[in-house]
Amino acid sequence: MADEGTLNIRYNSHATAEIIEGPQSGEADGSVMAYNYRLILTRDPANKIMVSKPANFDLALAKAASGGGFVPNLPNHKVAWNGGRLVGPQNDYPGGDWATRAAISKRYLDAMLMRLWWMQNDLDAPERLRKQFAGYGLAADEFPDNNHAPYEIYVREARRLVGRYVFKEQDNVIADGIARTPIHSDSIAITDWPVDSVACLPRNAPGSNTDGILFLGEETRPAQVPYRSILTTEVENLLVPVALSASHVG
């Protein structure tokens, strides 16, 4: 279970997908999910810009920026690459100033471009990745004034409101006695995606995936999001629908 307003790290087993309790389960540690960019790629010869080897290429960084995959079948022969999830730098983003956040964002973009070049050009890269990414370049007609990269990094999780209600793990699972998720009289939305977290820290427990990864596809059910979770406890006439009041697992 996740304490309200705190991060509850669990480990996800490769073989059985069972939860493996961590040594400090239930204690907050300040970690959030890894970030990345959603680069738009294409194999269209008339609309692709192949990535050259970055001047600051770092093989270790290229290999570390792993995870994720393609969102296929976008219009105009494009895919969205939801990968390059470098684990660790994101934890300094929520409390960082604008200069810190800009530096972290640049590190993620650099790492993704390094990884793309490595997967396409290094024979030591896994054959599966070389085949998957062969021929893909940045879409020339996407973000042409920003070197064809999105303007913003994909911030999965950062600073959040602690509001009049904290939406948490228990709101996403079957409640005792009613065979459904908890009912909120002030519900304003219904969740659709299962409880899901990408990696949070670059470490692995024995027999486990990277720290923080979980996907509770079987346990999660559609849940009601109460109006109170977007209301502050102190400020009137303010709604916070994006950075709403929720725990990490919520």
Language-model-detected regions and their locations in the chain:
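Flavin (FAD/FMN)-binding glycine-rich loop and adjacent Rossmann-like elements that form
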Residues: 1-249
